Regions:
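ABC family nucleotide-binding domain
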Residues: 2-202, 207-208
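Conserved beta-strand-loop-alpha-helix hinge in the C-terminal portion
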Residues: 212-230
Length: 230
């Protein structure tokens, strides 16, 4: 379980100080798929970055089971993120000198004996697995980043608009694969999106505005990506 209590985040100093997160509290259960909705500037991406340990906590706490992020040293936090989490953000951060296949293997804790072909095939890159990032389109590079994160078999997967660079059909296929994998492996998945339709596939939906949680909805009738359309 991830327990978030009275979480606060500031940007800037003095008169330019801005409260991006304002006393946010929520618990996220193990194996749960949570979608975070909100307009631009609502604090949803900041919330994701802080609870994932990518940004510092200015007030409150984030507790994974019994481990508090705010009490960890930089080294401890790096090890914790490496061993427990994976990220799919809008930036790709691919290694330009490695092929598609090797970039994906980089996410798997050096377990290079594992068969990654089913994963590569699922994101539609089987014919380009020997290509380099410079030979791929932006959407194809995003699919490599998605596969690399999934190759880690994370306990918690964080996603920030993961299919934003993909065309509608490819985005639907990739997202459907991610959701089905989450349901099978039961890792915790927390996704920021502007797409209210995608929220219908989640266990819970958190709505944010002005750095605060303004609503939490449970989905009693979860749908698949193919059922909802985009």
């Amino acid at each position: 379980m991830i327990e978030i209590k009275n979480l606060t985040k500031f940007y800037g100093k003095g008169e330019s100080c801005f409260k991006a997160l304002d006393d946010v509290s929520v618990c996220i259960n193990d194996g749960e798929f949570v979608v975070i909705l909100g307009a631009s500037g609502s604090g949803k991406s900041t919330f994701l970055n802080v609870i994932s340990g990518l940004e510092t906590i200015d007030g409150g706490s984030v507790v994974y089971d019994s481990e508090q992020l705010e009490n960890m040293s930089e080294k401890e936090l790096t090890i914790f993120r490496r061993d427990n989490t994976a990220y799919i953000f809008q930036q790709y951060y691919l290694l330009p000198h490695l092929t598609v296949e090797k970039n994906i293997k980089m996410g798997a804790d050096l377990d290079n004996n594992k068969d990654f072909f089913p994963l590569i095939e699922a994101v539609g890159l089987s014919e380009k697995r020997k290509k380099f990032p410079s030979e791929l389109s932006g959407g194809e590079q995003q699919r490599v980043a998605i596969a690399r994160a999934l190759a880690k078999n994370p306990k918690v997967l964080f996603l920030d608009e993961p299919t934003g660079a993909l065309d509608e059909n490819t985005g639907r296929l990739v997202l459907d694969y991610i959701i089905k994998l989450q349901e099978k492996q039961r890792f915790t998945m927390i996704m920021v999106t502007h797409n209210a339709n995608i929220a219908e596939t989640a266990d819970r939906v958190i709505k944010m505005n002005s750095g605060k949680i303004v609503g939490i909805t449970e989905n009693t009738d979860k749908k698949t990506v193919y059922e909802i359309g985009w």
